[in-house]
Structures are given as structure tokens and as C-alpha cells.
Amino acid sequence: MYEYLRGVITEVTPYYIVVDVNGVGYQVYVANPFKYEEDEHAEQKVFVYQAVRDNDISLYGFKNSSEKQLFLKLLDVSGIGPKSALAILANDDNRGLINAINSDDDGYLTKFPGIGKKTAKQIILDLKGKLSDVDSDMLTGQDNLDLDLNASSPYLKESLEALRALGYTKTEVKRISKKLEKYDGKSTDDYLRQGLRLLMS
């Protein structure tokens, strides 16, 4: 089972992206492919889920680990498959999705393709109160911690995400990000160690 792919995004289509990893092109279905247009021809880390059914093996991709986590939660719901879960995430308002589930708002859920009243109620029944471990700050389309890091090393991006996973707030991480951009790190660990030094100084 794959956790993520690191490679160059070589193609963006209306339904999927292609990630070239060491000369092998992986077709990855994503919720909103056009979010990846700015990353085309650049090396990126794409979190993935591999779905195997009958004679079909498909990869589904996500911008960050929290989006993938929410996808997996949706798969736990009876009647929700990978394509339905991806269609729900394509709405790009995952904070609203979580709020709707926790507030019994089945009307909000029925606006998604293929989600009727019965399935909406099932989503609420299965997931209400069970999404606290999903980091909603990373699910609002505000990838990379709302920081302008498009010109930075992918190692820097990963280190900032790791600092958030360690429990540091978005404000704390943002405070040191500019200093880290000037640091000549050679790996994610390099940036992570330097980030921890800055946070503890």
C-alpha cells in the first residue's frame, strides 16, 4: 500500500493527474485536478490511496495527509465508495463538511453528487463526533499553512507540515517560515531540525 508519491506532475486532466516517479507515470484521480495546475512540471509530494477491486487498481490522490484521512473516514460509511468520497471532497469546503456532520445537517450533505437523504443520514450516524483527529486547518484549501512557499524547496514544505503534526500552531510555524526559507537545507530533516531550534530559541 502506498502512502504517497514524490515525483513530477507531468499532466493535469479534468479527472486525474499524472505523476512521474523515476520514469514511471502514475495516473492519480484527485478531487479537483485543476488545483494542481500551478504544480505542473514541478516535483511534488502527493498523498495517495490505492483501491483494488476485481480487475481494477486505481490511485486516488490528496494535497495533504489530513485530506486523505477525511477520505478514509468517508470510506468507512456504508454506501460510500472511493469515487463518491472523492466527489464530496471536490466541493473544496471540508471544514463545512465536518461542521455539517457534527451538527446533523443532512441538507448540506445531499448537495453532493449521488448523496441522497438516506446516505446523508448514514454519514452523520457513522462519523458524527469521530472527526476530531482530522486537522480542519489543513482541509480548507489553505495548503502549505497559508504561506507563499511555491518558490521554496519541497523539503521546506514537508518540514513545516511535520512541525504542525508535532503540535506547533500555524502561527508559530508561520513565524519561523521566513527564516527557514533563507536556510540552505539539504533534506526535510535538515529543515525540521533547524525549525525546532528556532521554535525553542
Swiss-Prot record:
Does the keyword Kinase belong to this entry? no
UniProt xrefs under InterPro entries: DNA_helicase_Holl-junc_RuvA_I, Hlx-hairpin-Hlx_DNA-bd_motif, NA-bd_OB-fold, RuvA, RuvA_2-like, RuvA_C, RuvA_C_sf
Could you tell me which residues belong to the region Domain III? 151-201
Q: What's a single GO CC term here?
A: Holliday junction resolvase complex
Region (Domain II) spans which residues?
64-142
Which domain of life does this protein belong to?
Bacteria
Q: Biological process GO annotation list?
A: DNA recombination; DNA repair
Locations listed in the record = Cytoplasm
Q: Name one GO molecular function term.
A: ATP binding
> Could you tell me the keywords of this UniProt record?
Cytoplasm, DNA damage, DNA recombination, DNA repair, DNA-binding
Q: Which residues form the signal peptide?
A: none
The segments labelled Domain I in the record are 1-63
Indicate whether NAD appears among the record's keywords. Answer: no
Annotated region described as Flexible linker, given as residue ranges: 143-150
Q: What does this protein do?
A: The RuvA-RuvB-RuvC complex processes Holliday junction (HJ) DNA during genetic recombination and DNA repair, while the RuvA-RuvB complex plays an important role in the rescue of blocked DNA replication forks via replication fork reversal (RFR). RuvA specifically binds to HJ cruciform DNA, conferring on it an open structure. The RuvB hexamer acts as an ATP-dependent pump, pulling dsDNA into and through the RuvAB complex. HJ branch migration allows RuvC to scan DNA until it finds its consensus sequence, where it cleaves and resolves the cruciform DNA.
Q: What is known of its domains?
A: Has three domains with a flexible linker between the domains II and III and assumes an 'L' shape. Domain III is highly mobile and contacts RuvB.
The entry assigns this protein to a family as follows: Belongs to the RuvA family.
Quaternary state and interactors: Homotetramer. Forms an RuvA(8)-RuvB(12)-Holliday junction (HJ) complex. HJ DNA is sandwiched between 2 RuvA tetramers; dsDNA enters through RuvA and exits via RuvB. An RuvB hexamer assembles on each DNA strand where it exits the tetramer. Each RuvB hexamer is contacted by two RuvA subunits (via domain III) on 2 adjacent RuvB subunits; this complex drives branch migration. In the full resolvosome a probable DNA-RuvA(4)-RuvB(12)-RuvC(2) complex forms which resolves the HJ.
Name used for this protein in its record? Holliday junction branch migration complex subunit RuvA
Q: Which organism is it from?
A: Ligilactobacillus salivarius (strain UCC118) (Lactobacillus salivarius)
